[in-house]
Amino acid sequence: MKKAELLAPAGNMEKFKMALHYGADAVYLGGKMFNLRAGSNNFSDEELEEAVQYAHERGKRIYVTLNIIPHNDELETLPEYVKFLEKVGVDGVIVADLGVFQVVKENSNLNISISTQASNTNWRSVKMWKDMGAKRVVLAREISLEHIKEIREKVPDIELEVFVHGAMCMAISGRCLLSNYMTGRDANRGDCAQACRWKYSLVEETRPGETMPVYEDEHGTYIFNSKDLCTIEMIDKILDAGVDSLKIEGRMKGIYYVSNCVKVYKDALNSYYSGNFEYNPEWRTELESISNRSYTEGFYHGKAGVESLNYNNRNSYSQTHKLVAKIEKKLSDNEYLVAIRNKLFVGQEVQIVSPEIKVRDFIMPEMILLDKMGRETESVESANPNSFVKIKTDIPMDELDMLRIVL
């Protein structure tokens, strides 16, 4: 049986390595041009070469996003960049625009995935892309599980990729003009201002400046503000539909989000392919630990109703835990270099987060603060963000494991 791929976001090199450490089979990332995450750090050409080598040494894959909707003046440098991507050995590119698709076909033999931006919701469009030479189609988020099954039946010889977790867009597959209209920032060229998350009030034209409330609480009205997608409770049904890749959204999210999402969905995949799938409530508990706008299963059951919208404050993220540190390096059997992300105290109760679902409780031992040259300075009672400390403990940990606290 061919196993579905778990595809994780990587906004920079650190997130890339964390995604692989926690179990991703592949990552998708952007270079400095032609992708829809201008706010992400993204990868220079040198970093991209390094990432490809790092991934392939571990049997993992890399897909590069070329999913911008370009204007004429943005096409000039695309052919050379496509040739560069083929030269360094990326496993495929993700495109949304027919012109970009043609440039990739004319200048390389790269595998092409059709982006969710192309809004593929039916088997005819999927078959068209297959006939044109696409290897994979990332289906639109606005599609039901039953329609996915039908597409699989009618177009069996193309890979299907679906989103299983992350932020949802109120526009059709992200093709939104609100940001451009309101701020001049083009969402279709990587610069979305997330205007759908703003608070809106109703104004009647003969009463300028007099806003009228159309909400039931004090927060305002967030009529466009979607909850986040979470499909962990139906992941077996999605796999039964015959998809080839499960995609996690979030190139601009932090390492704790990426790592925890990956480990949860990887554990679910392993359970499914063991032949004895059983839903584990700890999966949902772990996903609640990361920052989220509350969860919905989106369009998988048909049209998404009001229950998929978040009517609370645009910043009403909820989470049960907070990242405080990352194991930067294992110095010896019981010594570790720790990168501090949030203030941390000696004697504080923390949890060790690793690729396994189970977390371990841990009391912070003595911390030796290091200076900018990496030299030991003094024992400290607390450590601040962006500092490094050395600790000793007999509790085994690995490089890239994380420490978190309960909120």
Predicted regions, residues:
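Surface-exposed amphipathic alpha-helical tracts and adjacent flexible/coil segments at the periphery
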Residues: 1-9, 13-22, 26-29, 33, ...
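Hydrophobic, small-residue-rich alpha-helical packing segments that form membrane-like cores
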Residues: 16, 47, 83, 101-114, ...
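Glycine-rich loop at the start of a catalytic domain that most often binds anionic cofactors/ligands
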Residues: 40-45, 76-82
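A short acidic, glycine/proline-enriched capping/turn motif at secondary-structure boundaries
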Residues: 69-71, 100, 119
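Glycine-rich, positively charged N-terminal anion/phosphate-binding segment
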Residues: 37-54
